[in-house]
């Protein structure tokens, strides 16, 4: 049974004056690809990341350090407004570092920031379509008949009406929380499988893609916590004739976005084809369960591309092909990706010629 979240009891306390002090909630990626956070009090309004201290936590409790040498450090990397506390309170996305100053093994932002710096003159933009699935606290798909199944896929994608969509109130709350926080969320929609949803983040330039997607995920699981709902980013949470969950990654450089850019898009696709296996290796765990060649996916063992082809590894949208410039969509990434790793390897392959 889920713990009840007492918003009505909490509300009067959130309305109290904070005495000139503010909350800073440090958020980080743990050793298993999940998210953790803890709060510190700051004595002044934070307007720049340099005002925030380097903090630490017990890495032995997050699978990031041994118990005998457990301190892991949090270095602030991006600031967002806090939609849960409001006011001038903030969320602080942080990188993790070992006590010898080296990045923790789960800190993929450190490397990708260097990659993005090398490619900054190309002005790379990304947009990620984050799919996810909602479950009751007992592990049942949210809104599904207990011990049974809803009707087959068909009416749920972008659906409207009772029995076709589930948890729209939660999804709307998350959308508004992202907008308030400053996350560059660009849309939402119900997905093909019932209780599966998608939100889109972007376009974001360079390293900010990973920052904004991770914070959007954090906001989602925090909002879902208030509803007593679990969020799954597993790429194939349910076996059977149900769609998996991906994180389709849209990508372009300035040259691709300008008239005549199709030749640069095609050149990028050729480079991506040559490193298919290297990309698959960082495109999410259990992705072989999703990339089967069915349910709008290409097969994990084969690279393919095409215009408006949702069964391909790389899709070029029809409107992009018609105009002759724009972007490409990499449909291989799973819903549980680390976006820093995905955006980083795309840059390495298409710009840095790794």
Swiss-Prot record:
One of its GO terms (biological process) is glutamine biosynthetic process. Its EC number is 6.3.1.2. Residues 22-101 form the GS beta-grasp domain. One of its GO terms (molecular function) is ATP binding. It catalyses: L-glutamate + NH4(+) + ATP = L-glutamine + ADP + phosphate + H(+). Keywords: ATP-binding, Cytoplasm, Ligase, Nucleotide-binding. Its main location: cytoplasm. One of its GO terms (cellular component) is cytoplasm. It is found in: Cytoplasm. Homooctamer. Belongs to the glutamine synthetase family. This is Glutamine synthetase. It comes from Amanita muscaria. The gene is GLN1.
């Amino acid at each position: 049974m889920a713990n009840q979240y007492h918003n009505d009891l909490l509300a009067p306390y959130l309305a109290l004056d904070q005495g000139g002090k503010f909350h800073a909630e440090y958020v980080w990626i743990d050793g298993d690809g999940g998210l953790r956070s803890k709060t510190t009090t700051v004595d002044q309004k934070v307007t720049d990341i340099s005002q925030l201290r380097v903090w630490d936590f017990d890495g032995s409790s997050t699978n990031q350090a041994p118990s005998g040498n457990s301190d892991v450090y949090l270095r602030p990397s991006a600031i967002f407004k806090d939609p849960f506390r409001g006011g001038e309170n903030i969320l602080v996305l942080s990188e993790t570092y070992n006590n010898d100053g080296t990045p923790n093994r789960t800190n993929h932002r450190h490397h990708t920031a260097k990659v993005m710096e090398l490619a900054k003159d190309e002005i790379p933009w990304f947009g990620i379509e984050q799919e996810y699935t909602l479950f009751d606290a007992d592990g049942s798909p949210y809104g599904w008949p207990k011990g049974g199944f809803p009707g087959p896929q068909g009416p749920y994608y972008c659906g409207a009406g009772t029995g076709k969509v589930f948890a729209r109130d939660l999804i709307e709350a998350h959308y508004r929380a992202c907008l308030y926080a400053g996350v560059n969320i660009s849309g939402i929609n119900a997905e093909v499988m019932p209780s599966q949803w998608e939100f889109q983040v972007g376009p974001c330039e360079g390293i900010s893609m990973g920052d904004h997607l991770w914070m959007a995920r954090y906001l989602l699981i925090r909002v879902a916590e208030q509803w007593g709902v679990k969020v799954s980013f597993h790429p194939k949470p349910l076996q059977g004739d149900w769609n998996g969950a991906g994180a389709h990654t849209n990508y372009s450089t300035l040259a691709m976005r300008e008239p005549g850019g199709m030749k640069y898009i095609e050149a990028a696709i050729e480079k991506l084809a040559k490193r298919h296996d290297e990309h698959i290796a960082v495109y999410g765990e259990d992705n072989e369960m999703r990339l089967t060649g069915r349910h709008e996916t290409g097969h994990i063992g084969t690279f393919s591309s095409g215009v408006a082809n949702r069964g391909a590894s790389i899709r070029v949208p029809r409107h992009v092909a018609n105009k002759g410039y724009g972007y490409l969509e990499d449909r291989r990434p799973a819903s549980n990706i680390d976006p820093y790793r995905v955006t980083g390897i795309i840059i390495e392959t298409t710009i840095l010629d790794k």
